[in-house]
Amino acid sequence: PDRRQRQMCIRDRVEAVPAIGALATIGVVYGALICWVQEDVKKLVAYSSVSHLGFCVLGLFALNPSGLQGSILYMINHGLSTGALFLLIGMVYERYHTRDMNRLGGLVANMPIWSAFMVFFVLSSLAVPGLNGFVSEFLCLIGAFSATPDNAQWPGLLGPWYAVFAGTGMILAAMYLLYLTGRLVWGPFRAPPADKNSGLPTDLSSREIGLLLPLALMCVWLGVQPSGLMRTLEPSVERTLAAYPELVPTQVESMAVLEEVNGG
């Protein structure tokens, strides 16, 4: 029963691959463009999640080991880096009760530790080599790029153009996240009066540092040594793709016949 269920699941997924791949690519670019018009920092990070998870879907529907491993790894990495960004935004809000970028800036002057964590997790979210996001994003793009019908081992219905268009989202992400960092961290200090009743220090407290530091260490570990986690994922990926070689060639042949009929 488990094998039949997997076959049904993968068969349905194979039939939907071109449409889902297109939607994922659109989501990557569209989510990045929406980020440009946001003045609320929390909304910007939330919409960036829409863009980032488009890579996750693209890798998942590449239906090959690289894409599937990258997609699962992306979910973990996204939870680390974006979760940390939400924590950092909340820590600023607790002090100044605003998330408006027009009212916040130059926070490195008063909050150097917060600023260091902010820059670090922005770089993690940007998939800078050496940090966790790079490996998963690279695998998702490689999976989509190499998933072509003429690939004998892992044929698929995506291809290079999906990866190329999704790659533009990486450029847009770098632009809006670096713009966000530049406005919040650097420049002249600007912020509403701090809430003295919050009981919080000007910069991060030891408790807040204790929350962020393990996330930062995980980002470094997964960026430098992802092989341990990827080996753990391999059995699940192999089981998921067990019926794939039987189903995809059939789907490719069906699409070729349909194209000939439509062409005739």
Give, region by region, the residue ranges found by the protein language model.
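Single conserved hydrophobic/aromatic residue that forms the stacking wall/gate
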Residues: 1-6, 10
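Structural signature of hydrophobic alpha-helical transmembrane segments
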Residues: 13-26, 75-80
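Residues that define the loop-to-transmembrane-helix transition and helix capping
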Residues: 18, 42, 68-69, 112-115
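Interfacial and helix-entry/exit segments of alpha-helical transmembrane bundles
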Residues: 21, 46-52, 56, 81-173, ...
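Cytoplasmic/organellar membrane-interface segments at the starts of transmembrane helices
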Residues: 111-113, 177-264
